[in-house]
């Protein structure tokens, strides 16, 4: 359905200095029922030019809200507008949820999931892990989350809360470019770094499904590393984006 529908902005909060989480209220909630990992396409007029941008839903399916996370991109018209101009009470327009960055949920099975996120690529992965933890009570989720520094980690407090609430089911490995006590958790996530992680911290042979969202070179390197450990292509899900269309993230 290629139709834009109104969404009332009911809350805006910052998860880091240059990223906001928007809570949105549709006139017709049924039109915005979503699967974990999906995204919304927004349109907005800027000086007579219509821009369309995709932003991933960061809420879980059982959160009872529709939320997207938007990180400000240098020179990005929509992301700057969302971070600096948009206010509670404004109305945005978006198409109903789209995307297939998910897998079927099986409440009776005990599955092991692995997620990799780079920067704002956490938004769809957060939706997936929250939904899995809520709807597959026997399943586990391991998240490897790469950022430049501690103060650039989106949803850091929420992730810690989730880890405490689901003790033993959610593991989080923060990878930072610097400032980590453990060398393994310092530096970019590339194929060599994955090989080290898989040797000492993550048993890929136990994993049923992997989700990867972040810069394309990182995702391709991770996928190659996972395949070298025996994961099949249909066990690896991507959410790709390019520099010219960063809105999804």
Language-model segments: what does each one mean?
Residues 2-91, 95, 108-111, 147-149, ...:
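Ferredoxin-reductase
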Residues 80-249:
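FNR/FR-type flavoprotein reductase catalytic core
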